[in-house]
Every structure is written in structure tokens, then in C-alpha cells.
Amino acid sequence: MDMMKFAPEPFKIKMVEPMGNLNKEERKDAIRTAGYNTFLLKSEECFIDLLTDSGTNAMSDRQWAGLMLGDEAYGGSRNFYHLEETVRELFGFKYVVPTHQGRGAENILSSLTIKPGDYVPGNMYFTTTRFHQEHNGATFRDVVIDEAHDPNAILDFKGNIDLNKFQALIDEVGAERIPYICLAVTVNLAGGQPVSMANVKAVSELAHKHGIKVMFDATRCVENAYFIKTREKGYEDKSIKEIVHELFSYGDGCTMSGKKDCLTNIGGFLCMNDKDLYIRATGMVVQYEGMPTYGGMAGRDMEAMAIGLRESMEYNYISHRVNQIRYLGEKLDAAGVPMVKPSGGHAIFVDARAFLDHLDQKTDFPAQALAAAVYEFSGVRTMERGIISAGRDIKTGEDHVPKLETIRLTIPRRVYTYAHLDYVADAIIQLYQMRRDISGLKWVYEPAVLRFFTGRFEPKNGELIKGF
């Protein structure tokens, strides 16, 4: 691999945290104690932690300095007004409602806009997003293009909405039963795949023609903007900031987890242009999150979010961010490790069904088994994103069976170097040579809701990796 393709990290390291790596027997005991669920491992038990990029970012010196400007007033914190001003400028929406994280924004949006019997279309489900939609009585309908479900389909914009599917849903149930379309930029479970600006425009036109709102899941919007700049004709000379602003000009609002592209450890917000929705949302924030000028966040964290959102739109940063993902993907792909292609904006998704093709998706849970095996073998923590994450149908109780059965190798922002990624790649490549020795799993405890967070399992064959 030509390292000249990959520029070094565009930052200097001012503070370090020691990393410990448990020995093999300690790792085997740790994953057993965690019920073979990587979510239940302790942080100190993980050598390299790729569980998520949510809230695991390294903040900059400017953000740390901003913490000292924290105004912790119960009402009217000046940090909120800085955040509000920043979001209005960069996103273009009229109203900003702070929440403790993206999940809080999802809850408010779903509670205020959905009524029982509604349908919410979107470009692939996300776990918590669909939960809030279904909890409030809606049915989620996937209207992403078919190629998004094919790990080997190579497209520049694999997260696009299929306009024919969207129109078919409108014809089937009526626009009055569709409060909004949830447009994720990027699409997490498709592999961090982006949506083109042309597709966003077309979706906006179709939705607004029928009186349907366009609500973005804006969590990784900066990564999406980078792909538009580098892949879509006519945007190569536009700044990331300009692209983000245009992107959101086609929508009516967004939910945002500040724990991703705001480069912070906590926080989120809900945006909208509808004044009535804003008034009702602030009322709900008071009930569940806090005052409308802090929404469950400390003032210092709102300040860090405002600074981080600007930093994330600096080209040197976002280029390095996406290239780290590409670097890891190219190493795995060159060794024949099956993965979702092309690599996305925040993670590499290893195709667990192809990796462990001796296991049955419905009864052996290959993604859950592979995530546990990667940890036991190397100390690297990853995340299951397959049938366990998909959960059960709220009406029938049957498992949702996703076409993609993956583990997610999620790269925290500004945390790991290329040397760390080399270790991850080498470990997974070695494990791939031992893949036939990995056992399937069975349930020991299945929670009723969002089961992937706290569910517990055990190997069907007694040991997870035979002879290891």
C-alpha cells in the first residue's frame, strides 16, 4: 500500500492516555463475564476501542479552552446562545432546541409529529430512531435504494432514497399518514454511505409536493458533505460549510447527535423552521431534558459543541477522518476480508455472514459471534450490527432479518493513529484465517427493548474460538 496516499494526522498530540492490553486468558474471562456482548465490556478491558464514534472523540485545545468559558446558569446560558448562533449560521434552520444527545432529539420529534397508524419512510433503519418512531405508533418503511443492502455493490452514493419506493408508499397509505421522511446523511447501517445532493433535492421536491416534511438525521452530515465534495460533479470547488448549508436548505429540520460531527463527548439538538413545532418542542424539553437553554447539557459542553462543529468543517480534518476509514478498508480488502464496499465515512463494516459462512444468521448470530471473537483474539472492541441489533417486529414478535449482517469497526475522531489501524487490520486478517473455529452463539438473556445493548449470550460449542 502506498502510504503517500494517506497524509499524516493533521494535529499534534498534547495529552496521552495509557493503553493496557489484557492477556489472552484475561480477555477470554472478560468476554465471558460480559455475556459475549461487547457493549458490556469494561472500558479498561479494551485495548483499542472501536465500539462507536459517538462521544468518543478527542477534543481540541480550543474546545478544552472553551470549557473554561462554561456559563452554568440555569436559564439563559450564554453558551446556548453561542451554540444557537453557530447552528443557525452553519445549518440554516430558524430554531434550535438543545438535548442531552441525539436520542433526546429523536424522542421529541417522534412524540410531537407522529400519531398511531402513521408511516415514517427513511433510508434504512437505525436502532434508536426506529424505536422512537414505533414507540409513538408509526411503522417504519425502508425506501433506500436496493444496492444499499448489497455489501458488494459499488456506488458513489449508496445511501440515496429510491424515489419510486417513496412515491409507492405515498400512493399506498396517503401523504396525510406520513408526517415526515427521515433522511439520514450518512446512512449508518449501510456502511456509513452518503446521499448525493441531487437525490436530496429530488426527495425534497417529492415530499413537499405532497405536504410531507423532510427531517434530516444530521449526525454525520459533515462526512456526507465531504463525499459530495469529492464525488459529485459541481461541488469540487465548494467548501464543506457551503455544502452543508445547501444540503439542509432542502429540509424542514433535523435531529443531531453532537457526539459525532460536533467532536464532543455529549450533547445534541433538534432543529426546525416550524415555529409551532418549536414552541411545542421547548415545552417537551422542559418536561424531559431541562430548560430550553440547556436541554440537559452543561454550559461548558454547549460551548465545546459550538467550537467543534466549526472545526469539523475544516477540510484538513474531515479529509483525514475519511481517509483513516479508507486506509483500514483497503488493508482488509487486499487480504480478502469480506466487507461492505465502498468504505464509508465513520467505520468499516465487516460482512459477518460471509466471514462466518458456516453459521446461520437466524440461529447462530454470526455478527454477534464475530464481534466477541475479535475481542477475545485481539482486545479490539467492535460492535454487532446484524440480526441482534435489528430486533423484533413490534407486531409479530418475529426477528427482523436484515440483509446486512455485519460488525462495525468504528473509528473515534482524532483518537487513533495509522499504527493503531495496522494492528486492527492485522488482527482481523489473522482471525479470518481461523474463521472456521468460531462458534455460533445462543441467547442467555434477551431484553424486551433495544436488546443489543444488554443482551447476553453463550457459545453453542462450549468455547468461542476452538482451541484458542
Swiss-Prot record:
Which molecular function term from Gene Ontology is one that the record holds?
tyrosine phenol-lyase activity
Note the coiled coil stretches, chain numbering.
none
**EC code(s) of this entry:** 4.1.99.2
Tell me which UniProt keywords the record has, alphabetically.
Lyase, Pyridoxal phosphate
Q: Which coenzymes or cofactors are required? A: pyridoxal 5'-phosphate
Q: Which GO terms describe its biological process?
A: tyrosine metabolic process
Top-rank lineage group of the source organism: Bacteria
Question: Keyword Lyase: yes or no?
Answer: yes
Q: Which family does it belong to?
A: Belongs to the beta-eliminating lyase family.
Q: Which HAMAP family match?
A: Tyr_phenol_lyase (MF_00543)
Assembly and partners?
Homotetramer.
Name assigned to this protein: Tyrosine phenol-lyase
State the encoding gene: tpl
